Amino acid sequence: MDEAEGRPADLGNPPGSAAQPFLRPSPMLLQGQDYFFRSPATLLDFQERMFGADLVADEPGDPVPCVLVLARAADMEMNELSLALAEHDIRMVRIDADRCLDLALTIYTDTPLIEFQRWLLRPVLVWRRHFDITAIPVDPTTVHGAYVREQWSAVANWLACRGDWEQVNSVHSTEHLDRLTQLQGASAVGLRVPRTAVTTMPGRSRPGGGRCIVKTAGHHLLEPEPGALRGLFPRPLDIRLSGEAREPAPVLVQQYLDADHELRVFVIGDRAIGFRVQKLDPAQLWVDPDSVVVERVEVPEDLVQRLLALCRRWRLDVAGFDLLGVGDEWVFLEVNVNCDWRWFEHRADCADVSTAVHDWVRSRFAELSTAKTGWGSW
């Protein structure tokens, strides 16, 4: 011990030399990532605006069947769904993570009813999409913020798992559907997958023996503060720069494959709708979307059957699959259960996915709302 200071002597530096600070390099996936997006919390939902402005007459009587959506204000797919359902007199209500702090909400545990604002409703179909706890506008480093996040996390998970409500994309399955589990499942149904390593030392990993890319094991977007989203996009692995450096958290190192083209396939129920995507690098979809070429294409029947098998395996109703066409093979990359389709439709000048989703939700709602089920005591 250093008697003067009461601390261990610095054994790593010679006497009289200054201690050198340890500088940990920035994680590889945070280097050069310039994508930033501010997610607005502006209310755009058609039905919520109409009901909130008292432009729709209340109907006395039994609780109103509805579609319950857990999302965030910027979820334009759900804004569009709200309008489409209103055209068929189907009530949709939503709980947005970035607008939930002053919500008047009571959820009954012994009967499948909720009081939402001043309305008594009976959810028959629940869809949790972009209800991200990180979007709740509180400071999680404070006791108050941590408390609010914890309560909403518990209740949102329960809402999305209740057995007396039907779910879109069962959360019981999707909450554990990480990228590595996806690769195992895809391989099990006969799809080729890239060789992949999980490591904190990417410079020492070259699955496949050739060029590789580094990918996040988690989400492609970080939200370090509510509403502020930053991208984590795949990047080429340069072993000259990475060397023996250790990452502070595991990443995926994946075999690079020379693809003829990339395919995004949306599966809605038993339908598959495909788009061919042409881009120079993975991040281009976000950082330079106007330069990405998207065209509507038919999906080969053998691929459709494999994707439907995956949806049955993972209990998915609506999902977006990313694949590569390599020679005469399809290579599975990942599935996105919170898939956004309007951008692909806009680039390809079509509305096929929106139409299919709206039709599927209406059909499922009609089946469920007319089913004779017990509500418990009220």
Predicted regions, residues:
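A short linear hydrophobic-aromatic micro-motif
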Residues: 194-195, 251-252, 318-321
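Short hydrophobic beta-strand segments
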Residues: 61-73
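Phosphate-binding site of ATP-dependent enzymes
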Residues: 85, 208-305, 310
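Short acidic-glycine loop/turn motifs at beta-strand connectors
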Residues: 89, 109-110, 267-271, 326-328
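C-terminal active-site "lid" helix and adjoining low-complexity regulatory extension at the edge
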Residues: 19-27, 32-40, 298, 312-316, ...
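A short beta-strand motif that forms the metal-chelation/ATP-contact edge
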Residues: 67, 212-215, 265-267, 329-343
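Conserved N-proximal alpha/beta basic substrate-recognition cap immediately N-terminal to
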Residues: 22, 29-30, 35-40, 44, ...
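Loop-centered beta-sheet repeat module
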Residues: 181-225
